[in-house]
Amino acid sequence: MSSLPVPYKLPVSLSVGSCVIIKGTPIHSFINDPQLQVDFYTDMDEDSDIAFRFRVHFGNHVVMNRREFGIWMLEETTDYVPFEDGKQFELCIYVHYNEYEIKVNGIRIYGFVHRIPPSFVKMVQVSRDISLTSVCVCN
């Protein structure tokens, strides 16, 4: 299966019931601290607000945050990282009424409460140390 370019940008329109599905594989051993980053931008510009950032430090922890008016807010972290070294993953981010629900390979790992409405999100960007197989949005 062919890979998508990384970073990968996708124009989106999110609402309650939407789901962003990302499939890929880490390209480095976990010993080298590879990362995966997913950003939900409020415009097609990388300088715009980020309604949700999900950054995985494979084999270590996950950091979630948002950026408003150029200022990063208080980050949330979890040490529960069910990714496997060298193995393909499926990351699903579900848009619920009050939160983004994050699942990896069908396992819920976190819920990030909305601070910026999902309807403001205009672009999803996937970046960092992964071979990206697919990115899609289901509405």
UniProtKB/Swiss-Prot annotation:
Result of altering C136S: Loss of homodimerization
Keywords of the record: Apoptosis, Cytoplasm, Disulfide bond, Hemagglutinin, Lectin, Nucleus
Keyword Disulfide bond among UniProt keywords: yes
Main location: cytoplasm
Protein localization: Cytoplasm; Nucleus matrix
Subunit structure: Homodimer; disulfide-linked.
Record function comment: Binds beta-galactoside and lactose. Strong inducer of T-cell apoptosis. Has hemagglutinating activity towards chicken erythrocytes.
Protein name: Galactoside-binding soluble lectin 13
Annotated source species: Homo sapiens (Human)
Gene name of the record: LGALS13
